[in-house]
């Protein structure tokens, strides 16, 4: 089996929910592979989005590019529907004035069908997520 970016639209991955949406910066931008696009929050926190893999995957490493995110919680589930999430990772990110935050998370027990990313707090009224990549393997397709 080959390792791939499981969060790529070419792998069939989708953002199926986001708590805020700006028509110029929609949540799909997180996984479109374009470094010029991003999703932005619309103020109030927490904000969240859910990524659906449409298959069972094993994530070995996550790389998140964001701006002004203070605390990020990531939850996962192996359910066929986006239910029964369990907390997986919670990180306080470092504020990087004028540049993107690059957070690399080496995953343990990274089995999932959905990931929920919760921006618990931010360094400003708005925050953005520019990209998420997940290095790993497809375990099986969903029945």
UniProtKB/Swiss-Prot annotation:
Disulfide partners: none
Organism: Mus musculus (Mouse)
Recorded GO CC terms: centrosome; cilium; intraciliary transport particle B
Principal location listed in the UniProt entry: other
Intracellular or extracellular location(s): Cell projection, Cilium
Tissues and organs where the protein is expressed, per its UniProt entry: Expressed predominantly in the testis (at protein level).
Binding site for Ca(2+): 29, 32, 37
Function of the protein: Component of the IFT complex B required for sonic hedgehog/SHH signaling. May mediate transport of SHH components: required for the export of SMO and PTCH1 receptors out of the cilium and the accumulation of GLI2 at the ciliary tip in response to activation of the SHH pathway, suggesting it is involved in the dynamic transport of SHH signaling molecules within the cilium. Not required for ciliary assembly. Its role in intraflagellar transport is mainly seen in tissues rich in ciliated cells such as kidney and testis. Essential for male fertility, spermiogenesis and sperm flagella formation.
SUPFAM superfamilies reported in the protein's UniProt record: Galactose-binding domain-like
Family: Belongs to the IFT25 family.
Reported phenotype of the disruption mutant: Null mutants retain the ability to ciliate and survive through gestation. They die shortly after birth due to different phenotypes reminiscent of Shh signaling defects: polydactyly, cleft palate, lung isomerisms, and structural heart defects. Conditional knockout in male germ cells results in infertility, abnormal sperm morphology, significantly reduced sperm count and sperm mobility and disruption of sperm lipid rafts.
Protein name per the record: Intraflagellar transport protein 25 homolog
